[in-house]
Each structure stands twice: as structure tokens, then as C-alpha cells.
């Protein structure tokens, strides 16, 4: 009997191009270590290079290579937001937005099997009413079907003090207090 995704005895090379499998094809686009984390960050509103680099603690050259690949693959779009010096932000394309169910499923799987004992590091909530996102990507409070555009992220009980979402929340609170 032939396995679904190629032969078991075939040695896996540096890529999946010879695999006749949709999962292998998807991994060619998003399977690199940083790719899904970059997509998650952009989905949650982090779109500029410096913020992505800071939040992910990834080397600048690695981030640039991954962003270029995601743009070339049509997952992200690069948009100019400043002329001098030229600076860009990264937006999800329709192809990138279609990864929303995958991102939520991986987050929820990680919350169940790989989160700190304190709980989920990131909580997703409905922008409209504040309800939690359930396993079907529905709002647990109002029942609305949610897309990436409908959701806000906040630091969960498992987020360390230095988590980017905690730092951003503290900075916003300080700005409000100073105003």
C-alpha cells in the first residue's frame, strides 16, 4: 500500500518539491521555522519590520529573507508607508488571510499541549464584543464567525512579563496616564 504523501523509505531532502502531497506543497510556502510566527504577528497587527524583529527576537537578516520569501509566495504584500527613508509594512494577502484557521488551530493546540502551566500566553478576543475565540473560530459570547480582521490579541495568563503584548499594553497605559 502506498502512503498518502510519498514513500516512507524516501530520504527527505532540503525541500518538499518532489512530494506529491498538498501538505508538502503548503510546507514549501509556510513550513520554515519563522514563517508561521511572522504570519501570526502580521495577523495580529504587527506589520513593520522593526516591530516584527523586536517581537520575534529574530536576526534581521533571517527576518528579511523570510519576509521576502512570503512576499514572493504571495502570502504577504509589501507596502510603502514612508518615503524618506523608504520604509515598508507587510500586509496579508487573501492567500495569507486564508491561513487564519490554521493559525488559530495551531495556537489552540499549543495552548492545550505546549503552554506554560499558568495558561495560554496569548488570548484572542472578538473585537466587537470582547468574547473569546472558540475552537470553531466563533465568538463564544455572541456566536459571530470571526476572521483575522475581527480579532484582538491580549497577553494571557501564561505570558511572561517581557511578552510583547504585555510591553505594548504597558506602553499604552503609560501614554494614557501621561495625557
Predicted features along the sequence, with ranges:
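C-terminal regulatory/oligomerization modules of transcriptional regulators
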Residues: 1-8, 111-179
Amino acid at each position: 500500500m502506498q502512503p498518502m504523501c510519498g514513500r516512507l523509505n524516501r530520504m527527505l531532502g532540503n525541500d518538499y518539491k518532489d512530494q506529491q502531497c498538498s501538505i508538502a506543497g503548503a510546507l514549501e510556502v509556510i513550513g520554515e521555522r519563522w514563517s508561521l510566527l511572522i504570519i501570526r504577528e502580521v495577523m495580529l497587527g504587527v506589520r513593520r519590520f522593526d516591530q516584527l524583529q523586536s517581537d520575534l527576537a529574530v536576526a534581521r537578516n533571517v527576518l528579511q529573507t523570510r519576509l521576502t520569501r512570503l512576499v514572493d509566495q504571495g502570502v504577504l504584500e509589501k507596502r510603502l508607508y514612508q518615503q524618506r527613508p523608504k520604509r515598508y509594512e507587510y500586509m496579508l494577502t487573501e492567500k495569507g488571510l486564508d491561513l487564519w484557521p490554521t493559525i488559530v488551530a495551531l495556537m489552540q493546540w499549543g495552548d492545550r499541549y505546549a503552554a506554560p502551566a499558568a495558561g495560554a500566553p496569548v488570548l484572542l478576543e472578538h473585537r466587537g464584543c470582547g468574547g473569546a475565540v472558540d475552537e470553531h473560530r466563533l465568538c463564544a459570547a455572541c456566536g459571530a464567525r470571526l476572521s483575522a480582521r475581527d480579532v484582538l490579541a491580549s497577553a494571557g495568563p501564561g505570558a511572561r512579563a517581557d511578552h510583547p503584548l504585555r510591553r505594548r499594553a504597558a506602553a499604552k497605559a503609560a501614554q494614557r496616564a501621561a495625557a
